[in-house]
């Protein structure tokens, strides 16, 4: 289905199932972290999936392409992003499989039935409100800083929304790993699988991907790290595979 583009918008090919997404370079375009998170979710994942802070809907659309789930919901608080994500869903004729809902992450368990999701994903703001320089663009500031919600909010709501044994998948920065693991465990979300992401094989980690299970037993698998570049400007085969090239 063709949809109307607003001023400054463009349509990008996602290289998956012919899916496309509407973006506005003057707003907040999705980055590699969202793609890596989608690739970290096992393809066999089915049932109901919720993406907290979905932005323009990139993660739900990629999960529809990569997993067995046909019941995916994206929750987003910013009206412009909600509207844009909805048009991307219609653009791909996925209205029957993906729903975009406007709402606050802090109120997610009031918007949706508790213990009703098999999996939750989130690419949350990485920086605390007092960390780093805030972007003058409100849209970008909300996406990058914990302006409207904290990771504590994300973990708390996730624990209420997941079914017992349900999975939580997130991407975040290594400098907050210890804090995030403590927060997860405080909400009965047991870390089960961790993958560090490095720009180069000999560089420090720049991101981590983590899977947690609600009510799971202790015991975490540390996976082989993901390396982004073979050399400057040249992606590794694993990155090409995740992107579908």
Model-derived segments and spans:
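Class I SAM-dependent transferase core
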Residues: 2-44
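General small-molecule cofactor/ligand-binding pocket signal
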Residues: 22, 99-101, 192-195
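Short glycine/threonine-rich catalytic loop with a Thr-x-Gly-x-Asp
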Residues: 28-30, 55-56, 202
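Residue-level signal for inorganic ion chemistry
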Residues: 37, 123, 154, 212
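Conserved SAM/SAH cofactor-binding pocket of Class I
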Residues: 40-133
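Mobile active-site "lid"/loop adjacent to the S-adenosyl-L-methionine
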Residues: 124-153
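Conserved Class I SAM-dependent methyltransferase catalytic core
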Residues: 148-199, 203-205
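SAM/dcSAM-binding transferase cores
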Residues: 204-245
């Amino acid at each position: 289905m063709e949809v109307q583009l607003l001023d400054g918008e463009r349509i990008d090919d996602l290289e998956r199932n012919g899916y496309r997404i509407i973006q506005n370079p003057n707003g907040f375009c999705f980055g590699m972290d969202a793609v890596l998170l989608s690739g970290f979710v096992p393809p066999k994942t089915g049932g109901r999936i919720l993406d907290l802070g979905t932005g323009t809907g990139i993660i739900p659309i990629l999960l529809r392409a990569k997993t067995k789930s046909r019941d995916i919901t994206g929750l987003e608080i910013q009206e412009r992003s909600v509207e844009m994500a909805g048009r991307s869903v219609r653009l791909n004729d996925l209205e029957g499989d993906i729903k975009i809902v406007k709402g606050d992450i802090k109120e997610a368990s009031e918007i949706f039935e508790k213990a009703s999701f098999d999996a939750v994903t989130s690419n949350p703001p990485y920086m605390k409100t007092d960390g780093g320089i805030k972007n003058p663009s409100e849209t970008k500031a909300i996406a990058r800083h914990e302006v409207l919600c904290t990771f504590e909010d994300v973990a708390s709501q996730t624990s209420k929304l997941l079914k017992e044994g349900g999975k939580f998948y997130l991407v975040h920065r290594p400098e907050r790993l210890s804090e995030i693991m403590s927060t997860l465990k405080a909400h009965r979300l047991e870390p089960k699988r961790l993958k560090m992401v490095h720009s180069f094989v000999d560089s420090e980690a720049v991101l981590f991907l983590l899977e947690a299970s609600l009510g799971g037993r202790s015991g975490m698998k540390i996976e082989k790290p993901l390396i982004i570049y073979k050399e400057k400007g040249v992606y590794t085969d694993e990155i090409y595979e995740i992107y579908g090239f």
